[in-house]
Amino acid sequence: MVSVPTGLRPSAVPGVRLPALADQVGAVMAGPDRRAAVPDVTVTGVTLRAQDVLPGDLFAALPGATTHGARHAAEAIERGAVAVLTDAAGVAQLTGGRTTPTLLHPRPRSVLGQLAAAVYAHPSERLTVIGITGTSGKTTTTYLVESGLRAAGRTAGLIGTVGIRIDGADIPSALTTPEAPALQALLAAMAEQRVDTVVMEVSSHALALGRVDGTRFAVGGFTNLSRDHLDFHPTMADYFEAKALLFDPNSPLRAHRAVVCIDDEAGREMAARAGDAVTVSAEGQPAHWRAVEVAPLGTGGQQFTVIDPAGVQHRAGIRLPGHYNVANCLVALALLDAVGVSPEQAAPGLLQTRVPGRMEEIDAGQDFLALVDYAHKPGALRAVLSSLKRPDRRLAVVFGAGGERDPGKRAPMGATAAELADLVVVTDDNPRGEDPAAIRREILAGVTESGCAAEVVEIGDRRAAIRHAVAWAGPGDVVLVAGKGHETGQRTGEHTRPFDDRVELAEALREAVGPRKAQG
């Protein structure tokens, strides 16, 4: 039974003296005399959030999008913070006579990872950390790696979009991509729980914003690159460069070893950038690891032959549909091999892997296939729909697009859906602060521009949209609800209401199956 550390922190931290921390990151005392000696207090934790402060913490007061963290310094100190780290703007906002040591750094975020790693005794050096990046497939690949590790008898930790796991147990957490202090604390807690290998998703945001600074990656994996996050990255080139921080020989974040899928141009460029990457391909590219003889396995699964760098053949199987998941599995196998787990050791775990909200089948006894998937960008939607499209069955897709995110992907998603599906139901995703109807219009513009003959319906209410697709489906058809996957809420404006595509689809199926059985 895994015991959960309070606040996902280790239960015991020896602590580091504040003067030593200041020296390590080049911080000085705030105030008129920048050469003043740094008080000799012991720091046992680091946090960005005043409400999370525990006695002995250093509170990092950073500039935010709308407010400066220094506004919350008084609360942090009241809760037991023994020191504050901030910039000049933060110092200017601190009020009253300061008795708590305040360290000044021109770019405090840039040193936060290094500082937190030092406080928690550099936990990634006590673990084998595998980092996986790419536009699509990160979550699935982390789950495949975790399953392979556990099948080989390793005590594994997982950090990703869906959540956190320690030795197979789900750990309640609101963290998705933890900030640097939370990540270092979590890695230290995992080390304390005798985890030996951690597999984690590494987003472009995490790399660009320093959230994984201070982490030593034993192996880095790259899945693919397609359009996404252009609300954050100004160009696709900038997006690529953020991912490349995990592989570039000149990057301080560079993983000790690299595994790269070269089935797209970005992967081939990334392999060249890394210089000594282990390559994988499910598309016939010349690579160290290859998949051949792909065949169906049961309902929705696949089996195939894996050829390793020595030319040895191994049989592998996954309970996940879609050829892109063969590529994800190859990346997982190569990563596992890099940390000493053979394909034979990993195989039983791979076959048992289920990933929440990723091509997740919902079965209520209906006579057609119903799935929920997280695909929320053009490339991912194309990959999923292509894997489901067959001439002997009809395909329906229910999807929308998130508000306050890259608007340039909306029309391409509409065009992709119209090209590959027989029924396209355009609905709301997470509109956030945007007009939901305006988002739907942008998607529908792409549908129109495609010139495809798919049946198209606009239903803003996501629950009603799902029910429409279920009512449309006949024996042997496929219904895909895409975009939200594992998410359990729908955000409109400032309000998030409970909403789970898996729950809604299951309920719609149960309602539909009853009358159909009665008619039969």
Swiss-Prot record:
Q: Write down which residues bear the modification named N6-carboxylysine.
A: 243
Cofactor(s) it depends on: Mg(2+)
A Pfam family this chain is assigned to? Mur_ligase
Entry keyword Nucleus: no
The lineage's top-level taxon is Bacteria
Q: Which Gene3D superfamilies match?
A: Mur ligase, C-terminal domain (3.90.190.20), Mur-like, catalytic domain (3.40.1190.10), MurE/MurF, N-terminal domain (3.40.1390.10)
MF annotations from Gene Ontology: ATP binding; magnesium ion binding; UDP-N-acetylmuramoylalanyl-D-glutamate-2,6-diaminopimelate ligase activity
The entry's comment on post-translational modification says: Carboxylation is probably crucial for Mg(2+) binding and, consequently, for the gamma-phosphate positioning of ATP.
Annotated PANTHER family: MUR LIGASE FAMILY MEMBER, UDP-N-ACETYLMURAMOYL-L-ALANYL-D-GLUTAMATE--2,6-DIAMINOPIMELATE LIGASE MURE HOMOLOG, CHLOROPLASTIC
Of which family is this protein a member? Belongs to the MurCDEF family. MurE subfamily.
What is the protein name for this chain? UDP-N-acetylmuramoyl-L-alanyl-D-glutamate--2,6-diaminopimelate ligase
